From Swiss-Prot:
GO terms for biological process: D-methionine transmembrane transport; methionine import across plasma membrane. Contains a regulatory C-terminal extension (C2) with a ferredoxin-like fold. The C2 domains from each MetN subunit in a transporter dimerize to form an eight-stranded beta sheet. Its main location: membrane. The keyword Translocase applies. GO terms for cellular component: ATP-binding cassette (ABC) transporter complex, substrate-binding subunit-containing; Gram-negative-bacterium-type cell wall; membrane; methionine-importing ABC transporter complex. The complex is composed of two ATP-binding proteins (MetN), two transmembrane proteins (MetI) and a solute-binding protein (MetQ). Residues 2-241 form the ABC transporter domain. Induction: Repressed by MetJ. Residues 265-343 are annotated as: C2 domain. Its EC number is 7.4.2.11. L-methionine binds at residues 278-283, 295-296. It comes from Escherichia coli (strain K12). This is Methionine import ATP-binding protein MetN. It holds the Pfam family ABC_tran.
Length: 343
């Protein structure tokens, strides 16, 4: 549905040249929810704005639904953009128009008959859960409701693609979850292809099928969400994953934790389990095999891309030789082990 090939984007600011994107290629199959994650300034917004040519690439090809956008005339591009809806971090609603009027705007601009406008807007407001807000004004809506109006407006022309530019970053966690569930529901009901950009791995984890990691204008990793979570290939991907699967060391342990081993100490470990290692009784097996005892301090389990993930903080009691052997055995069985220090 979306195929970006060798996209490069260069900005000129006076005598300065800024390369925002460097030879980026990305393929989003029809019906998928695809996430692009990166830190601020990585090139995410520039990338998504290249899809509908709000930013025209310096080099490269933009194919949407089989149509090469970069070769179209202005009138042809305007027509093609009707198949590409877009929502933003800021809702960009017209304060002087009601909810109905905001959603109706793109249809009115397209000279859609009034009866069809009324039918379509009513249908969309029901879809986004705002069937009772036809006559409300944006000033009377919550942030989540405003974003729902923006989603309905983006769907007014019945697009095949929806672009989401940090669409939940201005919302509180509970509202973010509800908007993500709405996007997932729309994707499922309408078969809509969704490309979203975010700096939060939790967004990717909740609804995306695939994810690409962008850094300094380059895609450094891309795969299914389950594969990236199970086997991250880059330090940046690992960092994003740890941001969504994290456990804080309790304060009383932080006060006692030392970087180097000392007499009668035990190592504190951070264990990450993915795939089959989540459900396997690996800690009890290490106790039997290596004569070590594991004191679990805290643990957390979650899902991403249909795959289960777990993280655990534990003390491992035993001789140095036994604990080293147990750690090596866990690593052989696809558990990521990090020695945080000694207590």
């Amino acid at each position: 549905m979306i195929k970006l090939s060798n996209i490069t984007k260069v900005f000129h600011q006076g005598t300065r040249t800024i390369q925002a994107l460097n030879n980026v290629s990305l393929h989003v199959p029809a019906g998928q929810i695809y996430g692009v994650i990166g830190a601020s300034g990585a090139g995410k917004s520039t990338l998504i704005r290249c899809v509908n040519l709000l930013e025209r690439p310096t080099e490269g090809s933009v194919l949407v639904d089989g149509q090469e956008l970069t070769t179209l005339s202005e009138s042809e591009l305007t027509k093609a953009r009707r198949q590409i809806g877009m929502i933003f971090q800021h809702f960009n609603l017209l304060s002087s128009r009601t909810v109905f009027g905001n959603v109706a705007l793109p249809l009115e601009l397209d000279n859609t008959p009034k009866d069809e406008v009324k039918r379509r807007v009513t249908e969309l407001l029901s879809l986004v859960g705002l069937g009772d807000k036809h006559d409300s004004y944006p000033s009377n809506l919550s942030g989540g409701q405003k974003q729902r109006v923006a989603i309905a407006r983006a769907l007014a022309s019945n697009p095949k693609v929806l672009l989401c530019d940090e669409a939940t970053s201005a919302l509180d966690p509970a509202t973010t979850r509800s908007i993500l569930e709405l996007l997932k529901d729309i994707n499922r009901r309408l078969g809509l292809t969704i490309l979203l950009i975010t700096h939060e791995m939790d967004v990717v984890k909740r609804i995306c099928d695939c994810v690409a990691v962008i850094s300094n204008g380059e895609l450094i990793e891309q795969d299914t969400v389950s594969e990236v979570f199970s086997h991250p290939k880059t330090p940046l991907a690992q960092k994003f994953i740890q941001s969504t699967l994290h456990l804080d060391i309790p304060e009383d342990y932080q006060e006692r934790l030392q970087a180097e081993p000392f007499t009668d100490c035990v190592p504190m470990l951070r264990l990450e389990f993915t795939g089959q290692s989540v459900d396997a009784p690996l800690l009890s097996e290490t106790a039997r095999r290596f004569n070590v005892n594991n004191n679990i301090i805290s643990a957390q389990m979650d899902y991403a891309g249909g795959v289960k993930f777990g993280i655990m903080l534990t003390e491992m009691h035993g001789t140095q030789q036994d604990t080293q052997a147990a750690i090596a055995w866990l690593q052989e069985h696809h558990v990521k082990v990090e020695v945080l220090g000694y207590v």
